[in-house]
Amino acid sequence: MRRDESSAIPNSQVDKGIDMFKKKDIFFKTLEEMADTLVKAVEYFADGVSNLSDVKAFAKRMKEMESECDQYTHTILKELNKTFITPIEREDIMALTTSLDDVMDGVEACASRFEMYHIKEKDEYITLFADILVRSAHQIKSAIYLLTQKKLLPMREHCISLNELENQADDLLRVCISSLFANVKDPIELIKRKEIYERLEQTTDCCEDVANTLESIIMRNS
């Protein structure tokens, strides 16, 4: 057998190698799609809470985007189950996927309360929380895109920003709860508003969880 024939790689092995890289790519591609959907959903949420003209349609559209994000989660789970080599640690992919999905779930849960509780009046504190969530979602998206480009150290700047935004949300929660108990006399209205404020703050905690997961990825791979 000639030397060039013995060293040639069979086409089947080449195809397997190509498939492997495609499977590696799907994790980053799907994470980018999750981040894109999250930004779209949070911006829609912010627009919705500043209007509230049709809370039923608002809640329905948010549920659709939450379901879209769930599909991305299922895609990643399916690929993890059949892929041996992944671009980063499997547990990091799973943790990042879960934390992104938690943010989306939190925003959708808040949106659903507007329909459930028949809230049709704008609230300045909810608007401020929504602004924090929009800025957080953009920080998450920027960090995810850096991750998929393997630019790990620049991700840290966005992680720090996410931590700062979560601190702002903590401060805002204290202010709005204080204002709520000082000014709202209707106990039912107080309960409704308080739950939404707290859910919004918890959603910023989920954004911080994304940052913590990204920090872990930086440490593992730097």
Language-model-detected regions and their locations in the chain:
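Cytosolic, long alpha-helical scaffolding segments
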Residues: 2, 6-222
